[in-house]
């Protein structure tokens, strides 16, 4: 063996050995038990999404270790933005306004490049700062996953005083702690479809709207969709449901209103919610439906998914109850001045009618399945073959208000859309 080959072998083998040791060790450490690190289905699914991992925690709590592990796990197509690299000392942002400006410019630059996995490593203890990041995620259509260390000392200021690299005092750490003690709750939790699954379902919904709009049975019922006496022979349903989600589609589980909604904190603290946060699921779509107010897709939840479904969401206006998960849906569009929450209510009314014995009238067969008219302008396409869509369970943390949605690689602003 030549000495040059021996030297190369000697430097190469320890790297492989270290990589195996680090990955196997991670599986055994409770502080590293995150689906996006340990579950290979989740890792594969996240490669199909645009995700902003926002690290939160006190200095020395283990954020940077987690950030490096995420980058190592997803390697290609991953970028980390660390406050440390900008010499930002944890504390008041006002003291580092120029540094944060540069950090945000770099982060936005990666967003414009459609980097699949972005990791932001900072304390992120201030609500105002997080709101800025959530708005950026909305603008570039990134889903957000908040990541907090699970280390035993993460909130122990006495230990953190010895561990943090900035040599912050006990008082400095105690000032940062209040913003990190409570769970940060989203506007709502839900399953967020991958980009490919969103496009597939969105296209299926659009084709259904076009087919329904051209169907002779639908044309006879236009009065439910058109106000006034002016006769009309056809309606463009794609334009009618012009209020559509701009980015990835989603199926809401629990509306939290950032912790203000009834039962929000109890839901977020459930062990199954904590374990499932940031994890991949496969949702089953059984039907597409249209009412004068909304267009949506019915989701059939399996036993695992039902564990994440709140028990109080399937109660229609009448007293007769429906099975758990009945309200599960994906909003595909809303008519003007209609809020997205109406989609689930419309689905409950349809299912309540079916349960009461009124199946509706089968009026024909479309390429994807049988079309039913349920009266009052309500239509359902029962899919002959269920659609399977991939999704990540996480939260939506933005304001749910119109934001300028930016193009990616072309760089221009596209339009102003409402997140629904």
Swiss-Prot record:
Family the entry assigns: Belongs to the 2H phosphoesterase superfamily. CNPase family.
Positions of S-farnesyl cysteine lipidation: 417
Gene: Cnp
Gene3D superfamilies per the UniProt record, alphabetical: 2',3'-cyclic nucleotide 3'-phosphodiesterase superfamily, P-loop containing nucleotide triphosphate hydrolases
GO CC terms: cell projection; cytoplasm; extracellular space; melanosome; membrane; microvillus; mitochondrial inner membrane; mitochondrial outer membrane
A Pfam family the protein falls into: CNPase
Chain positions with Phosphotyrosine modification: 110
Subcellular location: Membrane; Melanosome
Binding positions (substrate): 252, 331
Record note on what altering residue 329 to L does: Reduces activity 15000-fold
Membrane spanning residue stretches: none
Predominant localisation class: membrane
Effect of residue 417 to S: Abolishes binding to myelin
Coiled coil location: none
Source organism, top-level taxon: Eukaryota
Modified residues (Phosphoserine): 9, 169, 227, 239, 358
Key words of the record: Hydrolase, Lipoprotein, Membrane, Methylation, Phosphoprotein, Prenylation, RNA-binding
Protein name: 2',3'-cyclic-nucleotide 3'-phosphodiesterase
């Amino acid at each position: 063996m030549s000495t040059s080959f021996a030297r190369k072998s000697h430097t190469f083998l320890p790297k492989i050995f270290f990589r195996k040791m680090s990955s196997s060790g991670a599986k055994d450490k409770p502080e590293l038990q995150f689906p996006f690190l340990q579950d290979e289905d989740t890792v594969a699914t996240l490669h199909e999404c645009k995700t902003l991992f926002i690290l939160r925690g006190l200095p020395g709590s283990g954020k940077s270790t987690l950030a490096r592990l995420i980058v190592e796990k997803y390697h290609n197509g991953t970028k980390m933005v660390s406050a440390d690299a900008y010499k930002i000392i944890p504390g008041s942002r006002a003291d580092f306004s120029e540094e944060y400006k540069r950090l945000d410019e770099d982060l936005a630059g990666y967003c414009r490049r459609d980097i699949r996995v972005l990791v932001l490593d900072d304390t992120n203890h201030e609500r105002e700062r997080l709101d800025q990041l959530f708005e950026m995620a909305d603008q570039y259509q990134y889903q957000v996953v908040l990541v907090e260390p699970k280390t035993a000392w993460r909130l122990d200021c006495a230990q953190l005083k010895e561990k943090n690299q900035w040599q912050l005092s006990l008082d400095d750490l105690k000032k940062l702690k209040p913003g990190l003690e409570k769970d940060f709750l989203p506007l709502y939790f839900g399953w967020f479809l991958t980009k490919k699954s969103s496009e597939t379902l969105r296209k299926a919904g659009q084709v259904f709207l076009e087919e329904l709009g051209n169907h002779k049975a639908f044309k006879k019922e236009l009065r439910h969709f058109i106000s006034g006496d002016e006769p009309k022979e056809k309606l463009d349903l794609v334009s009618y449901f012009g209020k559509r989600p701009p980015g990835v589609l989603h199926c809401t589980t629990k509306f939290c209103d950032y912790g203000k909604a009834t039962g929000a904190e109890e839901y977020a603290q459930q062990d199954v919610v904590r374990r499932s946060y940031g994890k991949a699921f496969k949702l089953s779509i059984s039907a597409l439906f249209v009412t004068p107010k909304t267009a949506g897709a019915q989701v059939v939840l399996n036993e695992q998914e039902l564990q994440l479904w709140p028990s109080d969401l399937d109660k229609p206006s009448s007293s007769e109850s429906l099975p758990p998960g009945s309200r599960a849906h994906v909003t595909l569009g809303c008519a003007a001045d209609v809020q997205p929450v109406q989609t689930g209510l419309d689905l409950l009314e349809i299912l309540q009618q079916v349960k009461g014995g009124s199946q509706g009238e089968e009026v024909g067969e479309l390429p994807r399945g049988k079309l039913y008219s349920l009266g009052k302008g309500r239509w359902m396409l029962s899919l002959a073959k269920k659609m399977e869509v991939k999704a990540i369970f996480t939260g939506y943390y933005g304001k749910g208000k119109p934001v300028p949605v930016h193009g990616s690689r072309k760089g221009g602003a596209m339009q102003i859309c409402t997140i629904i």
